[in-house]
Structure formats: structure tokens, C-alpha cells
Amino acid sequence: MDRVHIVPMSDQLYEILKDQYAITKGQKYVFASPQKRDCIISRTTLNKMLMYIGLREVTAHDFRATASTLLYEKGYEEAWIEKQLAHAESNKTKASYDHSQHLDARRKMMQDWADIVDSWKD
């Protein structure tokens, strides 16, 4: 992806990243490759971990699809969801002129999503 993608964080994600940073302090990446600490994890790492914990039918992409579906069902704006998923605008004219990020709305949306995921733990 050659364009900037800003990802608003939930409180839960912020805490996870803070904890991970404390573990990897001094390393170039928060989620570094276990083999090469100066490189990021590979595209297949999450899927391999899902298989390792016994979720052979689940892929990392399934989490994106689940989030998208539930956020649409909760009534969030299509533009916010698509922007959060880093989907490119198919309308070339709109893509040329509309550079909105909807950061405040997406921050609330991602907090709502994180709260939903947290509720699954209970």
C-alpha cells in the first residue's frame, strides 16, 4: 500500500501496544520477526499462530470480515468502515477530491468494536 493509513486506536489496543513495547524495548519493531529482530513479522505469521492454537478453519482475514459485518450491523457509516479497512475508493473522482479521514468517528467506532470483543471474553 503506497498511501498513508491512519489507524485510530481503542483504549484496549493502546494498552496491548504499551505492554508489547515494554517487552520489545530497544527493538526496531513492536511486532518483530522472531528470526530477524530488525524485520517485521511475515504476512503468514498470524495464520500460522491460529493454526498452532487449533483454529485451522480461521484466518486473520476472517477477523476483518467479522469486524466489518458487525460494524455495518451496528449502523456505522460505510465510509468509516471502508476507511478503517484501508479499502481504496472505487470512484476515481471522489478519491481525487475526498481526503477525509473521519478520525473522531472511527476512534469511537473502534472503541465500540474493542468493547464488543472484550464482551466475548466474559
Language-model features: where?
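Short, well-ordered loop/turn and helix-capping segments at boundaries between secondary-structure elements
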Residues: 19-23, 55-56, 73, 77-78, ...
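Catalytic-site neighborhood detector that most strongly recognizes the C-terminal catalytic loop/helix
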Residues: 1-2, 14, 85-120
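Residue-level marker of regulatory loop/turn positions in helix-turn-helix DNA-binding domains and
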Residues: 60-61, 102
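Active-site/catalytic core of tyrosine-dependent DNA strand-transfer enzymes
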Residues: 8-57, 88
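A broad, structural surface signal
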Residues: 11, 15-18, 65, 69, ...
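Short beta-strand segments
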Residues: 3-7
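C-terminal catalytic core of tyrosine-transesterase DNA break-rejoin enzymes
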Residues: 41, 45, 51-52, 62-88
